[in-house]
Amino acid sequence: KTLGGKGNVIVHGGTPGNPMTASQAVGWREVFAKHSGIKVLEGPVDTNWNPALAQKVTAAAIAKYPKIDGIMAETTGPIRAFLAAGRPIPAWAGQDLNQLSCLWQDHHAANPTFKMATASAHTWLARLALRKGLAAVNGINNDEPSLINLPFSEDSTSSDKALRVKCDKSLPATAIPSAMVSKEDMRMILK
């Protein structure tokens, strides 16, 4: 929506062959196929979900491509690459992370193209999977869904207050806003 059906995009992935990057690629390829003006310059690029590697990969892309309109990434390394290069931060799609939200809060005013939408990092899915697994092993019915559609967690372009960007400087950078854990527990876990 933010790109208006046209623009140059770079997509980062995680580890080579991981199912999350593969399933996301199915989705974005389907969407981008409907918008011939969107060009994927690179991706999914394996970054091992490592912010330093993602920054390095993005720095190389910045040197190679004069115009990058969007990034899909799960780390904040690409933001640091744009800041270091003195280039405007482009539109961003990824997973919710406190550090990402705080970087948006700190830099969006000076970077009007830095619009951000995140989906839940879905750390809470382990809890759901464990309950379903235990129910299956013990012959107990579990009606929780097996397929989950991840809605937006944050959308800087939305007027919906529930989707506002959720920077909390009292929490560690690695805190995940959608984790369904109290702030106190998150501080303890991420010490």
Identify the function of each model-found stretch.
Residues 1, 11-13, 109-123:
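Short beta-strand elements at the ligand-binding edges of bilobed clamshell
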Residues 1-9, 23, 54-55, 98-102, ...:
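Hydrophobic alpha-helical segments within soluble ligand-binding/sensing domains
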Residues 8-12, 41-43, 69-73, 90-95, ...:
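Structural recognition of the beta-strand scaffold that forms the well-ordered cores
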Residues 8-11, 32-51:
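Short beta-strand elements in bilobed, periplasmic/extracellular small-molecule ligand-binding domains
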Residues 12, 16, 121, 130-191:
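Hinge/cleft segment of the Venus flytrap/periplasmic-binding protein
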Residues 13-23, 76:
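Extracytoplasmic "Venus flytrap"
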Residues 19-39, 57, 81:
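Short, solvent-exposed amphipathic alpha-helices that sit
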Residues 28, 47-105:
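Hydrophobic alpha-helical
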